[in-house]
């Protein structure tokens, strides 16, 4: 008989840096999941990513307290800030520009996000990411 799903937990955890402190510990603890087991598995799965990069994860908790998880690609905003070399987006994106991204960088981010985004094709994904960049106060070149 298949295991019954008890809960889905969505978190953003720094790649390679999962530990039992908040937000991971409380979110998993309330469902009775072995927190250290998750932390070890998550850190092993994300060791190929840049350490500290915020990585969305969806954890499926079953009624026998076992779990599975799926990692997603980092948010487009995080990848854009990294590409532009800025710490945060602009508070006033229409008047105050904080950095620049090139078309090649947007192409690279679109290819990275292709697994998670539901865009029809790579060009649609590029337009979506360019829109995110503009709303953060980044200038898109190209």
Curated annotation (Swiss-Prot):
GO terms for cellular component: cytosolic large ribosomal subunit. One of its GO terms (biological process) is translation. InterPro entries: Ribosomal_uL11, Ribosomal_uL11_bac-typ, Ribosomal_uL11_C, Ribosomal_uL11_C_sf, Ribosomal_uL11_CS, Ribosomal_uL11_N, Ribosomal_uL11_N_sf. GO terms for molecular function: large ribosomal subunit rRNA binding; structural constituent of ribosome. Disulfide bonds: none annotated. One or more lysine residues are methylated. CDD domains: Ribosomal_L11. Keywords: Methylation, Ribonucleoprotein, Ribosomal protein, RNA-binding, rRNA-binding. SMART domains: RL11. Part of the ribosomal stalk of the 50S ribosomal subunit. Interacts with L10 and the large rRNA to form the base of the stalk. L10 forms an elongated spine to which L12 dimers bind in a sequential fashion forming a multimeric L10(L12)X complex. Forms part of the ribosomal stalk which helps the ribosome interact with GTP-bound translation factors. Belongs to the universal ribosomal protein uL11 family. This is Large ribosomal subunit protein uL11. The gene is rplK.
């Amino acid at each position: 008989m298949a295991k019954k799903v008890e809960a889905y937990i969505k978190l953003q955890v720094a790649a390679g840096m999962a530990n039992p402190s908040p937000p991971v510990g409380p979110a998993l603890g309330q469902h009775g999941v072995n927190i250290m087991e998750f932390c070890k598995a998550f850190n092993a799965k994300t060791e190929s990513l840049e350490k500290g990069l915020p990585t969305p994860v969806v954890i499926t908790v079953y009624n026998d307290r076992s779990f599975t998880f799926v990692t997603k690609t980092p948010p487009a905003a995080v990848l854009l800030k990294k590409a532009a070399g800025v710490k945060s987006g602009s508070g006033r994106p229409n008047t105050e520009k904080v950095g620049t991204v090139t078309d090649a960088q947007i192409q690279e981010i679109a290819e990275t996000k292709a697994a998670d985004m539901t865009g029809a094709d790579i060009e649609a994904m590029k337009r979506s990411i360019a829109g995110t960049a503009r709303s953060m106060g980044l200038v898109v070149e190209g």
